[in-house]
Amino acid sequence: MTTLPRRILFVDDEEILRDTIEEMLIMLGYDVELARDAKEALEIARKEYFPLIITDLMMPEIDGTQLCKQLREINETAVIYAFSGYLTELDSEQLKDVGFDGHLCKPVKFEVLKHAIEGAFEKIHQRQGRAANTP
């Protein structure tokens, strides 16, 4: 099994939030790429591989659910998390139907983010293992 890059694409239209999350992820030892909207995220994802993508749901032009669908076409094995301050249990089921693997609520605490990222990379390793065992 090859070693996965510790890379995360984080998408949010709020600059202060992007900077804060970037700082947290760097403290956790991850290489972070930031995108300010869905269009920029798609451009980046077409050029580079990210095992984990975290995206805001409410963005101008293309929202997070549409972005998730388009990202799945580019990278079907990535773990994609929704990031929003307006999630309910019903929403989380709908997000899974769209293609999200999980979600984080704003504002996110450092320990919650750390736990979610660790869980995401466990999922990525499991997917990679299943793909390697598929004939």
Predicted regions and their residues:
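Acidic catalytic/metal-coordinating carboxylates
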Residues: 36-40, 63-67
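C-terminal output helix
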Residues: 108-118, 125
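Receiver (REC) domain active-site loop signature in two-component systems and cognate sites
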Residues: 59
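Active-site beta3 strand of CheY-like receiver
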Residues: 49-54
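Two-component/phosphorelay signaling modules centered on CheY-like receiver
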Residues: 15-33
